[in-house]
Amino acid sequence: MLFTVIGCSNTESNSTSSSSEAKSNDFKIVTSFYPMQILTMNLTKDINNVNLISMSEPNLECIHDHTFTTEDLKMIENADVFVENGLNLEVFNDKIISAYPNTKIIEASKNVTANESSNPHVWTNIDDYIKQIEYVSSMLQSLNPENKDKYSANEKDYVEKLNKLNSDFKDNLSKIEGKKVLVLDETLPPLCTFAKLKTIEIESDHENESISADAIKNTIEEMKKDNVKSIFIKKGSDRKNAEIIAKETGAKIYEFNSCMTGDVNIDAYLNDMRDNFKIISEIE
């Protein structure tokens, strides 16, 4: 069972460039938000005639909350390609298609099947993230054949690093397989799926802040019945409901990186997921 919510927390969402000013003949890529920015940064590493820009700030909690502006349209108008997560996460997609029907849009999740709750935050499952990388790479190679070999080499390098990360924690993750946890953030169920954990469903209108008293009561009863001792939340999120449930059940609260925001660093995803694997390996 997976926890599903509608929407995410909101912060500033002004456009930001992750590279130097574009030259007129550069291949221009615009990404929708932070996870796609980091992914594409790795694929375009050391390719001098490619200009990469993120449409949103790296502190935007969810692209659902991005207010699409005329500046965004101008940015996309001048782009050769727009890279998005897909799975209906970028709700403004129809505006892009309507304004620029010939814009090349790469939906990173094209080869990813959303889980049973249609959770689009698939990048916290490394297996699905690798599928995103491979698809974006293949499309960039097709659309920008001049740099085909470089995209391919960067894809291979990045996937090898991710596979190494998987290998480093394979034994630790196998020890927790099948354990049941309570998840209080919509970005974390795909991580649980990757770790082969069972998860408790709890209904909420927005993140974990509007959970009803009845929902909390029922969750506490289920956790006690199944002896669930782990609660997963996102780093920086409101701990109020998690602490209420933890007090009643004796469960421990674990904070994870959503990989939704962070430093604009080529190794950001690798570093965040390594931290997540260390934490998840310690659950009770």
Language-model-derived ranges and their functions:
Residues 8-284:
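Extracytoplasmic metal-acquisition and chelation regions
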